[in-house]
A protein has these predicted regions:
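DUTPase catalytic domain/fold
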Residues: 1-145
Length: 145
C-alpha cells in the first residue's frame, strides 16, 4: 500500500476510508459549518476539511459517487479532478446539481470519492508529421456505434 499523509482541520473529521476490500475509491465527506443549498443547474465548492501529501509520481483523482449521480443527479463538475503530489491545501469538491430540484449538502455527507493513481510523465518531441495509423484523424464516433 502507498502511504497517504492526511492533515485534518478538525479533530471530529472522519478520515476517508475504503468501504470494501475491493473498493478503488475512498469516500470524501463535506466539512461545513452550515448547510449548503445547490440550486438546479448551479455549482458549489464544498470543503472536505482535509489536506494530503502523496508520493511523487502519484495523483489523487476526485470522482463523483455513483449513488449521488444516479439517484440525485449530483456530480463533480471537473471530473476527474486532480490533486497533485505537491499540493498541500484543503481538498475541495466542485459539485454540480444537474437535477431540477434543490440539493442540500450537510456536514458529514459523502460527496465524492478519491482514487490514488500512478502517473507517467511524458517528454514532448515536436515533429512535422505523425506516424500513420489505420484510424488516422477519425474521432467523435468514427469507430462505430
Amino acid at each position: 500500500m502507498v502511504r497517504i499523509l492526511v492533515k485534518k482541520f478538525d479533530k471530529n473529521i472522519k478520515l476517508p476510508a475504503y468501504k470494501t476490500s475491493g473498493s478503488s475509491g475512498m469516500d470524501l465527506v463535506a466539512y461545513i459549518k452550515k448547510k449548503i443549498t445547490i440550486n438546479p443547474g448551479k455549482t458549489a465548492m464544498i470543503p472536505t476539511g482535509i489536506a494530503v501529501a502523496i508520493p511523487k509520481n502519484y495523483e489523487i483523482q476526485i470522482r463523483p459517487r455513483s449513488g449521488l449521480a444516479a439517484k440525485k443527479s449530483i456530480s463533480v463538475l471537473n471530473t476527474p479532478g486532480t490533486v497533485d503530489a505537491d499540493y498541500r491545501g484543503e481538498i475541495k469538491i466542485i459539485l454540480i446539481n444537474l437535477s431540477k430540484k434543490l440539493f442540500v449538502v450537510k456536514s458529514g455527507d459523502r460527496i465524492a470519492q478519491m482514487i490514488l493513481c500512478p502517473i507517467a510523465k511524458g517528454k514532448l518531441k515536436e515533429v512535422k508529421k505523425l506516424p500513420r495509423t489505420i484510424r488516422g484523424k477519425g474521432g467523435f464516433g468514427s469507430t462505430g456505434k
